[in-house]
Amino acid sequence: MESRLIGWDIGGAHLKAVLVNDLGDILSAKQTPCPLWQGLDRLDAELDLLTDTLGLTQYTHHAITMTGELADNFENREQGVMAITDLMARRFGTERVRVFAGHSGFLMADHVSKANVPEIASANWLASGLWGATRLEQALFIDIGSTTTDLLPIRAHRVENRGYTDHERMRYDELLYTGVARTPAMTVARRVPLNGGWINVMAEHFATTADVYRLTGELPEHADQLPAADNGAKNIAGSQKRLARLVGLDVDALSEGGWRQLAASLREHQLSAIHASIQLQLSRGLLDDSAPLLG
């Protein structure tokens, strides 16, 4: 029987899976919402769904990265890593489950211990970076997701990160907690231009960046898989209403074009912050002008 491998990225909000055959050909790629902070049973339920959808068998091998250990239903990252690893091993068998542990490679599930937690926790960025380094001599790796942005220089086929843990990477602007769907819009800008003046943005979770990019026309609907900030409609009208609350207005205070301009302003604030962090990485002098962006 053909050997298959599935790669799982177990996040705090989404579960991602890519199934490949023994030649490395991608057979299927899936992403499903998985609010892990609501309990491990949510992960179990989504694994049930994808196991059936992808036709996984007892012969399928499983490779795992994770960021879900940060979910606040876990006491700490150690508990999260061990709980997620145990669940996957219980479901699919310890002999067929490998967990990515950074430069230590993939560990068999029953070899994962507390000592490995710092290498395993939130290391999916490194898995991507190491793969990219096998293909390109130099590049700036950038991954903008629903919640975070990763930046990582690659030079001489080596990743050149200064931080490893989330805390360290945030210190060096290699990890930015800003993304295109789940980021609260209030965190993107302190104030925005409106009707010829400046208006401070309310520090309330009224809207997300999904609303911003929906109004700019750049958000594929499949990218917004979790409920809106108000649990309301995920359409143009719903996004306008949520952005209106952010600046203390009702939706009829501006035209559709006015709300689109507000969204464009928030977009520019977010992109400016990402651009500044890119400039910081480039200022290290590791890459020459021919280095491509890898994303």
Question: What feature does the model see in each segment?
Answer:
Residues 1-12, 18-142, 152-294:
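Nucleotide/phosphate-binding catalytic cleft detector across ATP-hydrolyzing
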Residues 13, 147:
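Conserved Rossmann-like nucleotide-cofactor binding loop
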